[in-house]
């Protein structure tokens, strides 16, 4: 089965072709980072308009890359939610228009299911079941993944997502957009232990997260720097140490909760997915813990940690392979800006 995947939930336009026999044939991605940088965050109206401009050129690119003709495609998968309503509508409209013109069925995909399954795109994919740490700008969850469509929420953030905390910390420190990669980069130059921040809910006894207090601690520390009248090189060094303290605290919590989830479920496989899954400090800490405690940890390719069409095409192929009745051939659709992953079922 050959599936075209279309991702448009936020500020990346992604298209890809995935074949159940040959794997990922082609994927192309356009990021809107440069467009939103002047605003310090994603502007939904601009995001929607840019998806309209980018989708068809990206379609032509993946078709040319793979030597695929429209008659070769069996179905079209699109991100149905969650995400920005306007952005989702653009992707859904394009998917259904193509499907109508080409006489193909469609299938709507949960954006987070795409992330959960994205590590299956690697050469040696993890078998089911596994624990998944889903960590991004909008979500931080621990899930037990028993099979495609069988997901149990073990823990989740009670306030800010980890990626959101990274972005807000970057803004408090005075870094550019997007903040997450910038604060991680700065943290690598900081001195370990120079600034020690709280580890929220580290010993809460459950698998939930909270990152709003960590963000507040960063703000408090920045005010101390101002009161001390740090400037020039001293201020830059203090900011680097603060970034290091923040990243160390966030990573400690993510690793500890992941280990607790593995212990609770008695599973030996951890899958890390979502944009923050590209963070080098997090990967290093989880890999070290895996080596010490004897479990396997799996990551998507770095290029597939961000939103992308490949994960949507894969999820579409897996769903239609197991539940052909989910194929939609009447081209009526809705989008779901809010959509609980645990509500999915085969």
UniProtKB/Swiss-Prot annotation:
Q: Where in the cell is it found?
A: Cytoplasm
A GO MF term? N(6)-L-threonylcarbamoyladenine synthase activity
Cofactors needed by this protein, per the record, are: Fe(2+)
The keyword Transferase is assigned to this record? yes
Q: What is its EC number?
A: 2.3.1.234
Which keywords fit this entry according to its UniProt record?
Acyltransferase, Cytoplasm, Iron, Metal-binding, Transferase, tRNA processing
Give the UniProt family note: Belongs to the KAE1 / TsaD family.
State the protein's name: tRNA N6-adenosine threonylcarbamoyltransferase
Which species does this protein come from?
A: Burkholderia cenocepacia (strain ATCC BAA-245 / DSM 16553 / LMG 16656 / NCTC 13227 / J2315 / CF5610)
**Name of the coding gene:** tsaD
